[in-house]
């Protein structure tokens, strides 16, 4: 098992953040502008958040696996997809939960408002089943405050929580559940996906035996070492790993050059 100290975690974070800032500046993104990436996308700890906000995040996170964002395209086709499925806000979670996948898939195929094809049936079935399961779970809550309280509040951190949620939602694994939580504003969670796992392995913080739960704890420890949310640590590494400054117009190849630069400095 890989070992590390608090000082090593702080050193890696400082190097990573400085590295990202430098590369961002080369593309015209200032340190101040970079900070916008450290804000959760669907923060429910704001005055106007509702359970609809939570469901929208579910529908987005459900597609955040391998190639599915290029199939579902929920971020670009949200209105078309919801219209095709007959879903309107405020969502009626009890009614949505009564659906079955084949019925919803047929609605998509028959809709004139939804121009994208559904030839990737397996991906759509996974996504639609998740949409049904998540509606069933949300139907247990009367309001957003009940939902937030059930998860322990904005600054909570309990790896058992994403584990329990993932069992309620079909094909919603541990990493996707963490993605869902962090983008809702539960800022002490990160997403232990392939990008983060490969990054930590390259930095010799993990090995092939390290679990997703352990990756989650390492990122939390690194965040604590510099007094920032785990969300921020996650996003720094994610931006380096994916090359995707999605709130700006440029993309960069950063992960390998970052790892090489850090290891060279040691």
Residue ranges and their predicted role:
Residues 1-52, 126-135, 143-266:
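C-terminal accessory module of base-excision DNA glycosylases/AP lyases that mediates lesion recognition
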Residues 1-123:
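Structure-specific DNA junction-binding interface
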Residues 59-67, 82, 131-139, 220, ...:
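Short, amphipathic alpha-helical segments that act as regulatory/interfacial helices
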């Amino acid at each position: 098992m890989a070992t590390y100290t608090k000082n090593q975690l702080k050193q890696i974070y400082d190097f990573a953040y400085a590295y990202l800032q430098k590369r961002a500046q080369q593309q015209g993104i200032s340190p101040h502008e970079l900070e916008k990436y450290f804000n959760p996308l669907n923060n429910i700890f704001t005055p106007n958040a509702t359970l609809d906000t939570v469901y929208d995040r579910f529908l987005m996170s459900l597609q955040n696996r391998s190639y599915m964002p290029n199939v579902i395209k929920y971020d670009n086709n949200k209105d078309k997809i919801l219209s095709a499925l007959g879903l309107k806000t405020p969502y009626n979670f009890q009614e949505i939960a009564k659906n079955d996948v084949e019925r919803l898939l047929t609605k998509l195929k028959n809709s004139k408002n939804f121009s994208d094809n559904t030839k990737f049936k397996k991906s759509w079935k996974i996504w639609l089943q998740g949409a049904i399961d998540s509606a069933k779970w949300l139907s247990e809550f009367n309001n957003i405050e009940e939902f937030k309280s059930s998860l322990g509040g904005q600054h909570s951190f309990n790896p058992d929580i994403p584990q329990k949620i993932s069992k309620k939602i079909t094909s919603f694994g541990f990493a996707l559940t963490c993605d869902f939580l962090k983008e809702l504003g539960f800022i002490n969670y990160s997403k232990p996906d392939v990008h983060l796992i490969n990054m930590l392995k390259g930095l010799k913080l993990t090995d092939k035996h390290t679990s997703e739960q352990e990756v989650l704890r390492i990122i939390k420890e690194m965040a604590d070492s510099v007094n920032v949310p785990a969300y921020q640590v996650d996003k720094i590494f994610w931006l380096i790993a994916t090359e995707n400054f999605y709130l700006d117009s440029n993309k960069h190849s950063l992960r390998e050059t970052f790892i090489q630069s850090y290891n060279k400095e040691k």
